[in-house]
Amino acid sequence: MAQAPHIDRNEEERTSERRWLTTVGPFVFLLLWSAGFPIAKTGLHYASPLTFLSIRFALSVGVLLAVCVVRRPQWPRNARAWLHLVVVGFLVQVMYFGLSYLSMTAGIATSVLALIVSLQPILVGVLAPKFVGERIGARRWTGLLLGLAGAAGVIVARGPLHAESLGPVLLAIGALIGITGAMLYEKRLGTTQDPLTSNLVQYSVGFVFCAPMALLFEHTQVQWTPTFIATLAYLVIGNSLIAITLLLAMTRAGKVSQVASLFFFVPPAAAVLSYVFLGEVLPAAAWWAMGVAVLGVAIATWTPRK
């Protein structure tokens, strides 16, 4: 009698995991990442921006330390590797998150902030030749122009610019410079490092810079309401841990292009979620302009199949 075929349970589980990561995973990541914008702005009603970030970073460090005790990941082997993590941590956690939170506190719409910082892939593509020797073509320049035109269109569609509205936009541009600088630095000088220790060092850098600034320049009173605790829990667990872990898992599954394409939808998704959570409404002209900006990012980052 013929024997039943042997089924490798481990392989079956790995296949099922890859299937989930390539179908459901990207949309879960998009939701978690996009919701971070309006949820962060909600939390800023209960704490000053740098105080809020300091608490978020401290909790993230605590959670990651506990995970590191269990997992025992590899730590940076030399001073150069430590320095790389510190620089990236400053650019991402202090400049990107710090200026983003200050921008939201100053009154920028979360949909506009999400759109401005989503131009990062275009700027990386345009600036890469100068910093990492990559060649730039007409397609990237076209994407850059469309992205900038769309972003400007969204800002103008919300009303005329004046000193009070220009400040938050400049802070958002500073956040864009921070995340772009981090990507360029990684492309040129970054080293491969375990994600656990990398995130732990970077969040620690964020805390070391933001906490003293909060003590010096902010009133550090926090309204520990259920809403604030919920937003903090979401940003620490949903954004800092689950979303980043999911992103890395999808990358390992070989779906980098699929993840990159979903980033095009972060601005409109953030706009919809900002309407749901905050009641922020974009005029019709702003939606058209956002479409132009998203198209620009898509054109600039699209890689033809070989």
What name fits each language-model region?
Residues 53-55, 112-119, 185-208, 236-276, ...:
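Helix-helix packing/entry segments at the starts of transmembrane helices
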Residues 64, 136-158, 175-179, 210, ...:
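Hydrophobic transmembrane alpha-helices of multi-pass small-molecule transport proteins
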Residues 2-54, 60, 161-188, 209:
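Glycine-/small-residue-enriched transmembrane alpha-helix faces in small-molecule transporters
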Residues 32, 36-37, 65-111, 116, ...:
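Specific transmembrane alpha-helical segments of multi-pass solute transporters/efflux pumps
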Residues 18-23, 46-50, 54, 77-83, ...:
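Juxtamembrane helix-entry segments on the extracytoplasmic side of multipass membrane proteins
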Residues 63-72, 120-145, 268-287:
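C-terminal transmembrane-helix exit sites in multi-pass transporters
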Residues 39-41, 64, 124-126, 130, ...:
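Transmembrane alpha-helical segments that form core, pore/gating elements
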Residues 80-88, 136-148, 168-169, 193-203, ...:
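Cytoplasmic-side transmembrane-helix entry/capping segments in multi-pass membrane proteins
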